[in-house]
């Protein structure tokens, strides 16, 4: 149905400014809003379906929606309303669209979605020939100056806009970092690995803020659609390789905080493919830290964080239940966890029209993790295994 809607929209010309110029200001603005909502939703669905080509591309010229209130628009108007210099009803839509408009022209995004389209991006895009890392810094400053500085953090819509922006930019930086370093012929330095962990931690911190605040309660249906699993893989694989790195202590703390707000589905379905995959990666990483602790004599390193204690407890519960039921579904030892079918990794992320974050695109992140160990094809990634019908209607 979404594909049909996209094709109808293109036939109507709502992706083209030349076609939109033939309509009244109100009609043109409504069409822009519709096009961008379709594009962002289609991009996320493409990620979840492991489909490489997304509608978010530099092949059309529809402008982002105007930063105006709905009351500023009327059928009688002959000219578009003046753009507001403060927060408006359309704030969240406008900011999301401006971020995505940047990304669809970015080389780090097109490298993963459709490299052939890089040739049609203007050479002067994104502040000239500066690095894309610097361009992302400039984008964040622009968004802050144009929109976020007018926001009230206690307002629900404004809070969502602020932290969605932070989360989106963190994911963009994470992808840009891997674009620069994944295929290098020389091994990554500790500084580069620390930078990757710091970016992954920032993704989880933003995600935790969004999921844990009462101000975002009515947006949970949307937040749960964007789970930052690549950040977990980045962190856990690095912690397995470098259990005593300078970012390790902070990483375990940040993962514990995010786990408390994110993994609500584990108590309902501990036999899910996701639980098995995540549990194995987590406990392997912690085992490496325990080995490093015993070898180095630092007992503080072996104090299990809340996330490890919780997962171990849940594994023990599942093992006990399995024994009681006289089944072989899930053994006590983590090495007994059955994981043996192909894994569509593109569905794991992240990030609202944020580009393709499929883990097959991150061979260096995966390291020694065998991507064929997992079978997540049956997982409802929209709600991480939580039945949408169980949500509070008040959300």
Task: Tell me what each language-model feature is.
Residues 1-20, 37, 68-72, 105, ...:
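Long, amphipathic alpha-helical regulatory blocks in the mid-to-C-terminal portion
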Residues 21-27, 220, 268-276:
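Short amphipathic alpha-helical segments embedded in low-complexity Lys/Glu-rich regions
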Residues 23, 29-141:
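Fungal transcription factor middle regulatory core
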Residues 26-30, 86-88, 214-221, 279-284:
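Juxtamembrane/interfacial segments around transmembrane helices
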Residues 44-47, 51, 105-119, 145-156, ...:
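Intrinsically disordered or highly flexible coil/loop and linker segments, enriched in small
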Residues 173, 235, 242, 258-326:
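Eukaryote-biased recognition of C-terminal alpha-helical segments
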Residues 220, 306-395:
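Intrinsically disordered, low-complexity transcriptional activation domains
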